[in-house]
Amino acid sequence: MLHVSMVGCGAIGQGVLELLKSDPDVCFDAVIVPEHAMDKAREAIAPFAPNARVTTHLSADAHTDLLVECAGHDALEEHVLPALEQGIDCLVVSVGALSQPGVAERLEAAARRGNAQVQLLSGAIGAIDALAAARVGGLDAVIYTGRKPPRAWKDTPAEQQFDLDALREPTVIFEGNAREAARLFPKNANVAATLSLAGLGLEHTHVKLLADPTVDENIHHVEARGAFGGFELTMRGKPLAANPKTSALTVFSVVRALGNRAHAVSI
């Protein structure tokens, strides 16, 4: 049985707990949240993981097999780095955090010191395996276009530049490289960062972001070209009802990763 501690109990964390509540190979031992959120977390996890303890941090003598981060960028510094130092493998959802200078290097260093591994999850996007494989032979271009309903861009710089509620046609709110996209839109940066880390890097991955009132889905389009040939991928992801900035596929990617760790056969 795989013993798991999870950082975060928001829309992603609760979705993961619900989908794995009947899996005999996965046991959630702890859910890690800020102190002010502990009571709410206890209530949220009760139907899915009633035996999991709610705590503010992973103890130094924790016997967990795996830490799963579902809490946002700050959780990498606060929880993932210490867990790696303790020798605990980690799964990371908030891949966009690695666009910040030095974060990727610190994660790798902590994992090496603890003889652990950190796995960056694909989240809302597919074909990461193909892109990473294509990089071995040489990539010429990786172009990502992200299209979301205007409401998904609330509380971002787009809200200062555009009247999102008044948009009547697809509108480009950003075009540039993945590093700049991640800096300006950190809560929407995970897909661009994941593609960059699998492919050409943050500086050389081209990103276009659109607010589109004609769609009610999060639409991701990836084009890659290189020595292998080329591919295009379009994904139309339904957002989580509890968080329109997040694709439901992100939850499913966590569930799949845990299953691959826990089950006898993985794919």
UniProtKB/Swiss-Prot annotation:
One of its GO terms (biological process) is NAD biosynthetic process. InterPro entries: Asp/hSer_DH_NAD-bd, Asp_DH, Asp_DH_prok, L-Asp_DH, NAD(P)-bd_dom_sf. NAD(+) binds at A124, N190. NCBIfam families: PRK13303.1-2, PRK13303.1-3. The iminoaspartate product is unstable in aqueous solution and can decompose to oxaloacetate and ammonia. Specifically catalyzes the NAD or NADP-dependent dehydrogenation of L-aspartate to iminoaspartate. Belongs to the L-aspartate dehydrogenase family. This is L-aspartate dehydrogenase. It comes from Ralstonia pickettii (strain 12J). The lineage of its organism: Bacteria, Pseudomonadati, Pseudomonadota, Betaproteobacteria, Burkholderiales.
